[in-house]
Amino acid sequence: MRTEWNALADEVVAGPNMLPGVVEAWWRHLGKGRLRVVVARDGAGRLVGLAPLHERVLVGRPVVRWVGHGMGAVGELLLRPASAHEAAEAIWTHLADTDRVVLQLVEYRHGGGGLDELRRSDRWQVTAELRDYCPYIDIRGQASAAELLAEPGRRKLRQNMARVDRAIIEERTGLRVHVLTTPAEIDAVIDELSVVHDNAEQAQERLHFLRGARRDFTLDALRSTAADGRLLLVLLRQGERPVGFHVALVTGDTAFAWLARFDPVAAALAPGHVMLRELVDLATARGLDTVDLQLGDDPYKLRWSSGAYDTFGVLAAAPGRLATARATASAIAFARRQAGRFHRH
């Protein structure tokens, strides 16, 4: 089914965490409970809908979530446009196999596939709250990052990049950009990526994707998406020292930012901007329409962005059981906070 899944992902421009290479890697290395990749097919047997989900029993209830829950996975159902309504209804009906199940779909994309059908379903009672947003860069009609920066509304960013370029030249920093796209290239630099990530985490603790089981997941996902021809990895070196990396995965007409970190030692050289400029150049060279920067309001993202879309936390349960679902979600959140407190001490 992998070939069909990839084709559907390209047709509907699925986000990076909805891709088979990422889903399979996550389940192999980080998955718990039961994998539930729910599919819908039309009368001819063609794949028309897919939901990459998993189910865990938490505080005594089966809870269904996106694959990649807790790692910034923006989700939606993958639905072929001509059959979207029917496919979404079939998927939501299938998931309502017991009135005890809770859907906890964090970071559901605003307007994302299947959301309207879930809200209108008589099998589910739904609540949603605004959670975050994803900036994006519209590069339609642009031939390069330089052309994008020449737009009248980007004067401050253009001046900032000019200062960075002068500093790189005048200070002879030896800053170099490398682009990696193949599994072999990933294997050759994975230790360098780990060094950058270690240094970034020491300065600001976030979530380390290159340590322990998450390292196994990340490396597996990078290899798999590279083999599928989706990977764009920008590696920044200062002399021989790696100081930054930015991973993007291409789906349809969009390059989605997936993971980026930089070493604070290079902060004065604006590595986030330098790598993003390279990513825009790579995307325009491929004839893509959009660079989706995914979750977060990092300043370097906002300076480049053309717009943004929202994400929602969606909670759903059988009619009459939403209050119980809310209590379940609260208990899960409390248990997670307690576990985090115990881990710190």
Explain the meaning of each model-derived region.
Residues 102-105, 178, 290-292:
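Short catalytic-loop micro-motif centered on adjacent basic/acidic residues
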